[in-house]
A protein has these predicted regions:
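Short, charged, surface-exposed secondary-structure boundary motifs
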Residues: 153-161
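Generic hydrophobic, helix-prone segments enriched in Leu/Val/Ile
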Residues: 120-121, 161-163
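Polybasic low-complexity intrinsically disordered regions
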Residues: 1-150
Length: 163
């Protein structure tokens, strides 16, 4: 899971992206398919730990998250992501920019933990409910126990017999 770390410095400027090739406007014609750029989670499963860590933003930035009561909380600073075992013993930790979503750090944390411990289960909350994380966990022969994220108002209750 992650926690906020407030920073005193100003939030850093985003790297201005290089000029992108202009895309064709409008809807694609029949039979035409446009390439989608792969998301960060799609790339992380095949890359090394070093490349995954270098891809994550590490500068001071604004972050926002909802607490358990639904109240939004925002801060300027960083986010500390920690991978723990039973008894809240930390195995690996990564400090990222506050704007990085928790799910984007799940695979690098798992890669760091692989070299340190052997585990059979991956227990995560609803923020990590992504097919890429499920597939990565199953590929390592772990059993993913990830709470379902209620998308569009429908929450699936976890049934232990089916998971």
């Amino acid at each position: 899971d992650s926690t906020s770390v407030k920073g005193r410095e100003k939030s850093c400027r985003k790297n201005t992206p290089k000029k992108k090739v202009k895309k064709k406007r409008g809807r694609p014609k029949k039979g035409e398919e446009r390439k989608k750029e792969p998301r960060r989670l799609e790339l992380q499963g095949t890359r090394t730990l070093e490349k995954n860590l270098n891809d994550l933003a590490k500068g001071c930035d604004w972050g926002c998250k909802k607490d358990s009561k639904g109240k939004k909380m925002s801060w300027r600073g960083y986010k500390l992501h920690i991978d723990c075992v039973d008894g809240d013993i930390p195995v690996s930790a990564i400090v990222t920019s506050a704007s990085v979503h928790d799910s984007q750090v799940a695979i690098p944390l798992a890669q760091m933990g692989e070299s340190r411990i052997t585990n059979l289960y991956d227990l995560m909350d609803a923020a990590y409910d992504a097919p890429e994380i499920h597939n990565y966990s199953k590929g390592k022969e772990h059993i993913p126990i990830i709470d379902d994220n209620p998308r569009r108002g429908e929450k699936k209750e976890m049934d232990p017999a089916k998971k």
